[in-house]
UniProtKB/Swiss-Prot annotation:
Any one GO MF annotation of this record: mannitol dehydrogenase activity
Keyword terms of this UniProt record: NAD, Oxidoreductase
Any Pfam family the entry gives: Mannitol_dh_C
Chain positions recorded as NAD(+) binding sites: 37-48
Name of the protein this chain belongs to: Mannitol 2-dehydrogenase
Family note: Belongs to the mannitol dehydrogenase family.
Length: 502
């Protein structure tokens, strides 16, 4: 039987052909459900995480009030709009592990709005009484958060554009849309929707609140006060490794499962979500599908810290040095015994001592789980994905561990090696002289600083929005990172790495 195009009409045939290896949604969609969630930034991670939890609630528990309306704010989001529209907003989740592959057609995304085509439609959707939650996966750079001052980058041209009252009906940024939608709800006497960040940031909810309230105060203090008093911004820790979809993934889906999907998602079996129980206008029963909903924000912060420092920090330790050394995939880097030992020792000796104990969580078991996940060859997790937008990642995943280690006079030389590798990475040339693309919103500034500084880290460290002032004045840190930068420049990653392994 020839592969079938994914759409509502073909679902039953797809299920029959796939047998036990393919699951399809059997719940009602379209006008039969309410779209209680508006999600900004429908990419791979959202479609492997929040959308899957909502799919499970709709499939297993009959939830009908929290279907998702996806929103794309950027011009490049037209590709997602077109892919989803061509298949009735269905898509395939491909779960891969050593045990095999499984396909799950997800139906929780009920519609999609492309803001550049109709910005008013997005604002109206946020203001609709059915909308209870606006969720976000907009990456670190989408928050306009200054890592040094912890304030909104209010001078950014996009923020300035959205602060102009003349542009209120045609905002550019997430905060411009959130403000416009909430202002309309305020005027209509509706409760504010919960703003639920699903991005990899510690205190993601608190940061989102502060950024939006700061934006609103610059526009309308009365609306800002209402948001501060009535709004909800739960903190959350999210986790699921989700590589970029390749053409090979699409081909394998058609060959193995008989499904033709314009944009499937590949992911691992592991998934985790810990979220603070802080919602302003109701929420789905997340607990029924394995989400850890906690009352104590401190508990969320502890989970966040574990995940960001261990998983994301280790990803950075594989990504930037691995790219410089010529590797393509995470599992390839982990197959190298030097890298495997380096990452384990960094986790155990430099990061673990800085982490809080969480009742019921064994850090050593967690580290072992991470090693197992990183070595999964079936998901083909690309290093360029790990390395994307590093200016929003390194200040969260690596530098705080260095700063804390300095404070308690602990070891941090391996962490410095990772930072030094990133400083070389921003130049866009690997150890063999082969150029690669650096994708980062701060690329021009980073590369200018890297060229000016050479093997001296001081120029890059002068970017206060990323590094502040404290590290530049610490002699231990400057000595370690300068040594690492010089060694990498002279000998390359693979010859330098053994110096950082005991």
């Amino acid at each position: 039987m020839a592969p079938l195009k994914l759409n509502s009409k073909n679902l039953s045939q797809i299920a029959a052909a796939g047998g036990a290896l393919v699951k399809i949604p059997t719940y009602q969609r379209g006008r039969a459900v309410k779209e209680g969630i508006v999600h900004i930034g429908v990419g791979g991670f959202h479609r492997a995480h929040l959308a899957v939890y909502i799919d499970q609630l709709m499939q297993k528990h009959g939830v009908t009030d929290y279907a998702i309306c996806g929103v794309g704010l950027q011009p490049f989001d037209s590709a997602m709009r077109d892919a989803l529209a061509s298949q009735d907003h269905l898509y395939t989740l491909i779960e891969r592990s050593a045990k095999g592959s499984f396909a799950h057609v997800i139906g929780s995304i009920n519609s999609y709005l492309f803001a550049p085509d109709n910005r008013e439609a997005v604002i109206a959707k946020m203001a609709h009484p059915d909308t209870k939650i606006v969720s976000l996966t907009i990456t670190e750079s989408g928050y306009y958060y200054n890592e040094n001052t912890h304030e909104l980058q209010s001078e950014h041209p996009d923020i300035q554009f959205d602060l102009d009252p003349a542009n209120e009906k045609a905002p550019r940024t997430t905060f411009g849309f959130l403000y416009a939608g909430l202002t309309r709800r305020y005027q209509q006497g509706l409760k504010p929707f919960t703003v639920m960040s699903c991005d990899n940031m510690q205190k993601n909810g608190s940061i989102t609140r502060h950024m939006l309230e700061s934006f609103a105060r610059l526009r309308n203090p009365e609306v800002a006060e209402w948001i501060a008093e009535e709004g909800a911004f739960p903190n959350a820790m999210v986790d699921r490794i989700t590589p970029q979809t390749s053409e090979n993934d699409k081909t394998a889906l058609a060959d193995t499962f008989g499904i033709v999907d314009s944009w499937p998602v590949v992911t691992e079996p592991f998934t985790q979500w810990v979220i603070e129980d802080q919602f302003s206008n109701g929420r789905p029963p997340f607990e029924k599908v394995g989400v850890q909903v906690v009352k104590d924000v401190h508990a969320v912060e502890q989970f966040e810290k574990h995940k960001l420092r261990l998983l994301n920090g280790s990803h950075s330790a594989l990504g930037y040095p691995g790219q410089l050394a010529g590797f393509k995939y995470v599992h390839e880097v982990m197959e190298n015994p030097l890298f495997r030992k380096f990452v384990w020792q960094m986790m155990q000796e430099e990061v673990k001592p800085l982490l809080p104990e969480i009742p019921g969580v064994n850090i050593d078991e967690y580290c072992n789980t991470l090693i197992e996940r990183f070595t999964n060859p079936t998901i083909m997790d690309q290093l360029p994905r790990i390395c994307l937008n590093a200016s929003g990642k390194i200040p969260q995943f690596i530098m705080p561990s260095i700063a804390e280690a300095i404070w308690v006079t602990g070891p941090f030389r391996r962490l410095c090696f990772v930072a030094a590798a990133w400083f070389h990475y921003v130049k866009g040339v690997d150890d063999s002289g082969k150029p690669f693309e650096v994708v980062d919103p701060m690329r021009e500034e980073l590369q200018a600083k890297a060229r000016a500084g050479g093997n001296d880290p001081f120029e890059l460290l002068s970017i206060k929005s990323l590094f502040g002032d404290d590290l530049r004045s610490d002699e231990r840190f400057l000595k370690e990172i300068t040594t690492a930068m010089n060694d990498i420049a002279r000998d390359g990653i693979m010859k330098t790495l053994p110096k950082y392994i005991d």
